[in-house]
Amino acid sequence: MQKSRKKKEKKKQKNRMLMAIMLIILYLGGLFVYAIPDLQKIVLQKENEKAVEHFKEEVEGSQQDKSGEETDSTSADSNQIPKNAQLYQEMQAYNQQIFSDGQSGLTDPWSYEQETLDLSQYGIDDGMIGILDIPKMDVTLPLYLGATQEKMAKGAVMLGQTSFPVQGTDSNCVIAAHRGWKGIPMFREIERLEIGDELTVQNCQETLTYRVSEIEIILPDESDKIMIQPGRNMVTLMTCHPYTQNSRRYVVYCDEVGTQPEAAVDAAEEADSSQQEIITTSEQNRTEALEEDQRLIERDTLWRKAGYVGIGLIGVLIIFGFIPRKKH
């Protein structure tokens, strides 16, 4: 009788142990699946940081190679000009070309995936042409040429048939990015930008600073809204709107600092003034839409944190559920 009882007790403990192991495996599996977006975020951020650092090193290396060597680009053999300088000249020439052509090939910007220059001849195989830094949004992204899905998954992209971000006038570099991608914010917090805020774009030769001059919400097919504006050197940021949808486009127009037209400067000063009394109906509607987007972003963040708290509590219950209780 005693042996039979011990045997049953042993079997019960064994079954209990197997159940505990199964629950732990299921729990860890569920935790891993839930954490995948955050793990992807860590991996992608590391890759972005690596790409950004590599680009900076390449630019610094090129600048050091040509330091002390003054070359007259109008008379020297093009083979004697550093590759970055050649690329920069080709970018400027391309900007002049599309302005002269009236950007005739520009339709729905999201469909423009092609690289407008052959970057491989300059030793650029990944299509990265710069670094976009937006302090107000706390994001630094690699900038790629061509809006392919693969490149948009890695950072910001310059749309085809728009200008390169280099010095000059009559140019508008349209930069697009996802409204958040696999945990990386990208342009998720684009509504933080206000008129007067600044951002920088580092190209293969220099770092240019741009100031926000206007913000607008447009339809996807309103390509005329992102065309070159004569006399201005611009960067235009664009992403889907509203948050989690893509029925419209949220557009932020920026002018290179020092080249802003008088109207844009006046707009920035007006936005900074606490005495602003007139708010148009369209601006009121835009503000309400932005507040709704911000609520959705905050809700998603809160639910994500709450999910981890819930998973933690389940883990505690599993542990306490299988701790042997002392018999009185």
Q: Where does each model-flagged region fall?
A:
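Alpha-helical transmembrane segments
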Residues: 32, 313-326
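Solvent-exposed, non-transmembrane regions of membrane-associated and secreted proteins
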Residues: 6, 11-305, 324
